[in-house]
């Protein structure tokens, strides 16, 4: 007595169409199912699906009232069903021929019931509202459709004490559509230097394998905002998933309202300059000099232009540098080298601010992004030196 899988989940939450707040990645799609555990005690969920074709895929369970994650499972850790393989571990052309089963259960589920469960995400039994998110990165690019070429996983509710299946539980309204706890963002500071800091990630339905560095930018008329760093390696195939520095990395630009308008991801940036750096130039989409700026960027290896429409999106920009699934052996991991900036600092209270650990260039060296704002004419001049982008004064 269950609806079709696509009807069980909420509609596709797309990073690319300005319907999602909280600076989503444009190349990610999300789906959410939320139910009231308070009204349905002892009820867990069994998800059965086929592996979607994408760069990255995971499930995260949240306490919907706090928007904090309580458990998650990543693609490579999902044990496949009998006679299936996991295409994120073993290369195959046919992802969708392979099935998986995931259990989402309260912490008080009896051991006897757990004995036969392979993939378990649990939540504390004092959670009132349980939200399950499924995320896919680059599904459209890899499979041609946002679902990764397969149906959504089917949701079956069951009683964890008896094992008996029960009717589908009504999907409640998830807070991601309503009241996100967004920190105050102040874009009024107009310094030319653009330091990057690690985002405080316990907010707004964080994706646990992801880490973010951000810089707040006020882009004035006639200016370009620039930043550069040495990027991590990303995999070209499944066989490189275990050895690449990160599974995926991207740069996204979001507005003061926290919508995302521009993204570029690793595969779209095949080149670095002779020192191993990538350089980003954020230019006003309405600038008369845009063709000249683009020509100058194209003439320099590893330099990429991102356009920003100041007229429509305002002059406040949040630049986000995202790393997904950071390799434990990567020596330049932002997760290991940087401390998150305290929320108080976003509001201006700098008492808990430690620059050596909280400014990317100081904590991560050349691998930490650092930027500078120049006039368009300065950038276009023959004497422009890319090394000046990372100066702190």
Model-derived segments and their meaning:
Residues 1-393:
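A compositional/structural signature for long, glycine/proline-rich flexible linkers
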